[in-house]
Amino acid sequence: MNYEIITDRFEIEKMAEDMFLSDDEILVHIDYADLCTLKRHGTFKHAIICDIELGNKAWVNEIINVIQSQQQPIDTLQAFLMNIIVGDEGMSLSHEDLYELLQFLTSVKFTDNDTEESRTKNYTDCLWSLSNRSSFPDGAMRIQLMSTYDKTEQDKQEDEKYEQMIEEYRKPFYPPLDLPITELYPNDKE
């Protein structure tokens, strides 16, 4: 398994936006409103991109080991946003493996001393999507795991700047809203 760590906020936010902007065939999706909610209440600060061969039966344990090795502050962790991309023949993704990974992610803040009440409080949200990318080789899978953390005062001050950067990033994908209908649909004469 190959993996890459990203800590640049703008790069992580672009990766999250790409879940909605790509041409991948969406099999399990989240709403864009969910992404907006994550960004409103938390800040993307860390991401792991893992390229996996589905024939590797230990991939879940390998990802868990990578996550645990990152030394990220668990106490301010809010949520995970996970994008799973498989190739055309990659539908052999095991539900049991996916469940095991999701179970780890949602309980990452649990301790041995947790009571039932504190477990409910320490539960970590994990939103995920699954898409198919035909350009991926058979049996290949990519997991993009993005983490949001509590907003600091500095994060709040920088929010507007990052929002403007994302708006600029999205422009090529969407026509401007101030164009007349004839310019939006030039082939439609009526």
Regions found by a protein language model. Name each.
Residues 1-190:
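Tubulin/FtsZ superfamily GTPase core signature
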